């Protein structure tokens, strides 16, 4: 996470797009480059409020973020071990999440996120993903991840849900 009064200013230096107009509960996709203009990584930036953001990427960039943050009034924290993420992609993903009582999930706009309750657990769901199809990413406490996985797969007999790892997702990445 990136927090502090310079959080937005720091992220604007870090990535190749301007996030001055980002609103809470919005997500942006971005690239970040080093000082020589070479691509370091890509990922998503989640805005919780004016001074609180989450950066999600496939590679570990913590040291580079910390080095880049010198001179900014920000706190950078690696929250990788305190949050779990499940990508749930495909044309039936909205329907299945709705059947799990993620009420109004169908109203969640692309590149936005909100809080939903599934199995009496509060989770964050973003309408993001890189499969090119309708999809969501579900964010929860690590202790909730197994139950969330089981809830999703409880529909396997009717909807033929398939588990796929990051390598498989990278193959369909657009």
Q: Which ranges hold each PLM region?
A:
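Basic, glycine/lysine-rich polyanion-binding surfaces/domains
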Residues: 1-174
């Amino acid at each position: 996470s990136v927090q502090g009064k310079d959080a937005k200013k720091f992220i604007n230096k870090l990535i190749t797009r301007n996030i001055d107009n980002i609103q809470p509960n919005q997500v942006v996709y971005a690239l970040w480059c080093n000082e020589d203009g070479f691509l370091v990584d890509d990922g998503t930036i989640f805005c919780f409020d004016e001074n609180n953001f989450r950066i999600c990427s496939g590679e570990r960039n913590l040291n580079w973020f910390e080095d880049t943050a010198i001179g900014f009034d920000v706190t950078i924290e690696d929250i990788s071990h305190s949050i779990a993420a499940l990508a749930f992609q495909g044309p039936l993903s909205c329907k299945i999440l709705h059947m799990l009582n993620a009420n109004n999930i169908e109203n969640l706009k692309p590149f936005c996120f909100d809080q939903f309750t599934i199995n009496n657990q509060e989770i964050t769901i973003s309408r993001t993903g890189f499969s090119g199809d309708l999809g969501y990413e579900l964010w929860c406490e690590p202790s909730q991840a197994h139950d969330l996985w089981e809830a999703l797969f409880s529909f396997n007999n009717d909807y033929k849900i398939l588990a796929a790892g990051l390598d498989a997702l990278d193959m369909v990445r657009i």
